Amino acid sequence: MTNKRLSPQHKGAFVNTIFSGRLKHKVAWIKENISKTSEKKRRKEFEKFCAMGGEVRDANRFSSEELATIYVELFTLRWQGKIYCFKYEDLVRTFDALRHLIFGSVLFLNARPCAFDIIFMCSSPEWIYFDDINGGYDPQYTTLNLGSILLWLNTSNARALCAREKKTMRFSLGIYKEFWSYKKQWCDIIPLGRTIF
C-alpha cells in the first residue's frame, strides 16, 4: 500500500502535490502559544496534583522494559480494550532502538505511575518535531485531569527546549477526527497534503 499523505511541513517542498483545506485527512499540531487563562488553569491543576503527593519523572530515567510495562498498564486502564494497545515486546524493541528520541515525563501518585504518553522527538536545523503517539492514565484519578496535566507539562518543556535552541516547535497529537474533538482546545487542525499521482 502506498501512502500519499504529506505533512504540512512539506508544503512547497515538492512538485506533484496538493495542499487544500478541503482534503479529508487532517493533523493536530499543538498551538505555538497557550492562552494566559489556560496556563493558569493547568498550573492550578498541577499544583493540586503536587499537593496530593504527585511526582514528575523524566521518561528517560526508566529502562525500556519499565516504560513498556508502564505504558501497557496505563493504556489498558484508560481505554479498556476500546483501542488496540501495542504489544509489550514490540514496545521494548522500539524503546531500545529509539532511546535517543524519547521525550517527556511520567506522572506518579502514591509511588505508582498514573499517566504516561509515548513521545518521540527529532531535530532539524530549523525546527524540532515531537510526535505524541498516545498514552494512558489511571482513571481512578479522573478528577485530577492527569491527561491535561501531562500534556501541559510535556508541551511546556517542548516549548522551552525550542526557545533555548531557537527553533520552531512542531508538536503533533496525530490525526484529527471529530470524535477526538478534545484536541481542538490544544491544537491547530491542519489539512495534510497529498501527492497528485
Say what each PLM segment does.
Residues 3-25, 31-142:
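A conserved beta-strand-loop-helix scaffold within acyl/acetyltransferase catalytic domains
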Residues 1-4, 26, 167-171:
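Hydrophobic beta-strand segments of well-ordered beta-sheets in folded domains
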Residues 101-197:
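Aromatic (often tryptophan-rich) hydrophobic motifs at membrane interfaces
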